[in-house]
């Protein structure tokens, strides 16, 4: 049902450090959280090259670490990085990545 969808933008419920001198530190802020399905999405304004498999398609290691932290804190297995379409990234043709846990 459409009314069951709760979408949060720039969600700020969690921090990387929950208690340091009784304060939260390093606030997490995924761009989109679909709560009823526990889906985390983060938008990136970077150029992806779907032909550059050796260079991880231009996906940064820092972005993958960030998504991993979101997976842990939100207890989510459905995580997406969203990139703009360019002449080197025309369709979502890159195979999914799976974290080695």
Regions found by a protein language model. Give the residues of each.
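Catalytic core segments in nucleotide and nucleic-acid processing enzymes
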Residues: 2-101
């Amino acid at each position: 049902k459409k009314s069951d969808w709760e979408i949060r933008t720039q969600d700020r419920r969690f921090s990387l450090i929950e208690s340091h001198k009784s304060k939260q530190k390093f606030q997490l802020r995924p761009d989109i959280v679909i709560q009823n399905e526990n889906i985390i999405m983060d938008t990136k304004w970077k150029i992806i090259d779907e032909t550059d498999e050796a260079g991880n398609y231009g996906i940064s290691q820092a972005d993958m670490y960030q998504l991993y932290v979101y997976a842990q804190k939100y207890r989510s297995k459905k995580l997406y990085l969203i990139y703009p379409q360019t002449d080197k990234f025309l369709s979502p043709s890159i195979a999914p990545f799976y974290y080695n846990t």
